[in-house]
């Protein structure tokens, strides 16, 4: 078997792309070769965009969605139902639900799922801030939109018990296999999942 050898700078670039989620060696090579074909001005604009995003994008102080301001556009939108909160694990899940165009409330991004195997406990997630947010506001319903997995179920049950004294807690219905990621679910399935949510109280 002949091993492919790259010049050191190219090998380094490919190595960086391979660190991206979902990017294998072949895709990393394709991306690196594409980058090398671009004019220097394009590469400079790209690198500046990366640095700007890394420096200026942070978390919304209210829901922990990604934003470049104190509050994200969704939280600031007065047309959204502020009394209806959908809890998601990551911003990518929020974006998936927004693509479905079914949910008209606001969100709370907890930043992951409870996973003892990975040493991720409730204290490492934005669960306490969620409880504080709900306890200090008039919330009609909390919708848990967490991945259908052991970790997702554990997190949903944990949050459900904490929030039950304050408001109605539901979980979206799933028409997908255990372990499926929300970001890969089509818009129609997500819309139906929201409509068919079940009560956890």
Swiss-Prot record:
NCBIfam families: recR. Belongs to the RecR family. Transmembrane segments: none annotated. May play a role in DNA repair. It seems to be involved in an RecBC-independent recombinational process of DNA repair. It may act with RecF and RecO. The lineage of its organism: Bacteria, Bacillati, Cyanobacteriota, Cyanophyceae, Synechococcales. The keyword Zinc-finger applies. HAMAP family: RecR. GO terms for biological process: DNA recombination; DNA repair. GO terms for molecular function: DNA binding; zinc ion binding. The keyword Zinc-finger applies. Residues 83-177 form the Toprim domain. Keywords: DNA damage, DNA recombination, DNA repair, Metal-binding, Zinc, Zinc-finger. This is Recombination protein RecR. A zinc finger (C4-type) spans 60-75. Disulfide bonds: none annotated. It comes from Prochlorococcus marinus (strain MIT 9215).
């Amino acid at each position: 078997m002949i091993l492919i050898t790259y010049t050191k700078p190219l090998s380094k670039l490919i190595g960086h792309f391979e660190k991206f989620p979902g990017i294998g060696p072949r895709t990393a090579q394709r991306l690196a070769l594409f980058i090398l074909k671009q004019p220097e001005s394009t590469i400079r604009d790209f690198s500046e965009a990366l640095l700007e995003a890394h420096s200026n994008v942070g978390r919304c102080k209210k829901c922990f969605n990604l934003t470049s301001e104190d509050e994200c556009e969704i939280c600031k939108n007065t047309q959204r139902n502020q009394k209806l909160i959908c809890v998601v694990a990551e911003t990518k899940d929020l974006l998936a639900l927004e693509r479905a165009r079914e949910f008209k409330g606001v969100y709370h991004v907890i930043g992951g799922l409870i996973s003892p195997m990975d040493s991720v406990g409730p204290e490492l997630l934005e669960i306490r801030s969620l409880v504080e947010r709900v306890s200090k506001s008039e919330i009609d319903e909390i919708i848990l939109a967490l991945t259908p997995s052991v970790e997702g179920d554990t997190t949903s049950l944990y949050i459900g018990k904490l929030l039950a004294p304050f408001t109605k807690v539901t979980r979206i219905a799933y028409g997908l296999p255990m372990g499926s990621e929300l970001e890969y679910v089509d818009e129609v399935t997500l819309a139906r999942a929201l409509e068919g949510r079940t009560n956890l109280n």
